[in-house]
Amino acid sequence: MAVLLGVCNWVHPLLQSPSCCKELKEAGIDAIQLDLGSAEEDFPLSSPGIQRQWKEEAELYGIRLDAVAVLAVLKHGMTAEPGSERRNTAEKAIAAAVDCAADMGIPRIVLPSFKASAIRNKDDLRETARCLRLACALAKHRGIAVATENLLDVTMMKSLLNIVAYDNLCSCLDLSHFVLRGREDVFEALPEHLAVCC
């Protein structure tokens, strides 16, 4: 398995422009994860012009466009009531991310379960599973993987994967989220967590 050093483009304003690819390459960065952008701005990464710029710059400097992150679900929760404005917006963001990934040749989308999409109880888990199932159904026929990023322990993560029951669903494990919340127990089950990562 090859290891790539990557960065998320929302962590610093300078990384939000495709022109950052040159500096990333010079710094030894191999890959970048792109944010779809906000619903209020009509998901900027959906723009063909912006997509073209990212693809051209990434190809020129050998930077892998690794994933489309759907940060819009941090505000418009996947756990919101089905049919509500927030849930509808989350589902539109998911569909837009799948389209972007397919159009740009990006292999996966990432759906974070934090803030408005945090999984706090069984109802949240059920609604998250429904959104993940929608994402997987949209993504599967386009050859796109769906990564869920959350704070579930390994038993609950495996349960979520089984509930959704799509082979294009996997886990995106960011250990910093666990450490920042005092959840060092994740390290005890690290091999099991890594087994379901994409």
Question: Predicted regions span which residues?
Answer:
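Short coil/turn linker and secondary-structure boundary residues
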Residues: 15, 46-49, 82, 184
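Histidine-acidic metal/acid-base catalytic patches
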Residues: 1-6, 13-30, 59, 105-106, ...
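A broad, structure-centric signal for solvent-exposed, well-ordered loop/edge residues
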Residues: 14, 19, 41, 72-75
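Short active-site-adjacent helix-start/loop capping segments
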Residues: 40-43, 66, 74-79
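A generic secondary-structure micro-motif detector
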Residues: 9-10, 43-44, 87, 125
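A cross-domain feature marking catalytic cores of carbohydrate-active enzymes
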Residues: 7-11, 34-38, 67-72, 111-113, ...
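Active-site acidic/histidine proton-transfer and metal-coordination neighborhood
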Residues: 18-19, 56-64, 76-171, 180
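Glycine-rich, proline-tolerant flexible connector loops at the mouths of alpha/beta enzymes
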Residues: 33-58, 113-120
